[in-house]
């Protein structure tokens, strides 16, 4: 019995199944927005035990812009010295760079899963708990849970470029502690 036609049919079905069911379009959680072609995930540059990623920049129909970051803990655990693990993130904050200011930010949101969002009114505070860091930051008071991604959103009035060298801080448990790192964030206005 010649199995070649059967193998070819099975292979064709497998390829079609992967194409049809292997990819899914993510739903648009805000029907007043459209995807901006400037989106490009960018991870942290240095010094954070957490993975901070600029997930997307969205141009909204009302001419505002939504920036979404995610944070995850790639080595969740107790943070005990020598364990190779990191405690859950408690909170983190970003500086606004040299071109953006707090008056350009309409509101912020945090989400433990990217689905349910809690809005907050962003404000700038001077960070004093991280040794050697004294820059004003916008804090996100939501952390991470194990290795799950948490999401953070800021809606701004102006179209801003992206810069890879924004200063940021993280706060964790007593064993992992706090620190400063560099990440992708607000650059200067673009057309």
Segments from the language model and where they lie:
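Bacterial N-terminal signal peptides that target proteins for export
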Residues: 2-10
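Sec-dependent N-terminal signal peptides
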Residues: 9-17
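Bacterial signal peptide processing site
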Residues: 24-26
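C-terminal motif of bacterial Sec signal peptides marking the signal peptidase cleavage site
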Residues: 19-22
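Extracellular or exported targeting regions of proteins
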Residues: 29-191
């Amino acid at each position: 019995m010649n199995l070649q036609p059967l193998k070819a049919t099975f292979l064709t079905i497998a390829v079609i199944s992967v194409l049809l069911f292997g990819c899914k379009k993510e739903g648009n959680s805000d029907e007043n927005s459209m995807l901006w072609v400037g989106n490009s995930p960018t991870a942290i540059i240095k010094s954070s035990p957490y993975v901070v990623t600029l997930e997307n920049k969205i141009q909204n129909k009302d001419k505002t812009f939504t920036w979404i970051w995610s944070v995850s803990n790639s080595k969740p655990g107790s943070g005990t010295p020598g364990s190779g693990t990191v405690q859950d993130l408690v909170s983190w904050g970003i500086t606004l760079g040299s071109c953006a200011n707090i008056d350009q930010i309409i509101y912020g949101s945090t989400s433990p899963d990217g689905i349910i969002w809690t809005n907050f009114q962003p404000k700038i505070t001077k960070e004093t708990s991280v040794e050697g860091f004294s820059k004003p930051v916008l804090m996100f008071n939501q952390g991470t849970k194990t290795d799950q991604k948490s999401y953070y959103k800021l809606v701004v009035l102006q179209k801003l470029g992206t810069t890879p060298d924004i200063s940021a801080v993280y706060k964790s448990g007593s064993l992992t502690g706090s620190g400063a790192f560099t990440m992708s964030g607000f650059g200067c206005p673009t057309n």
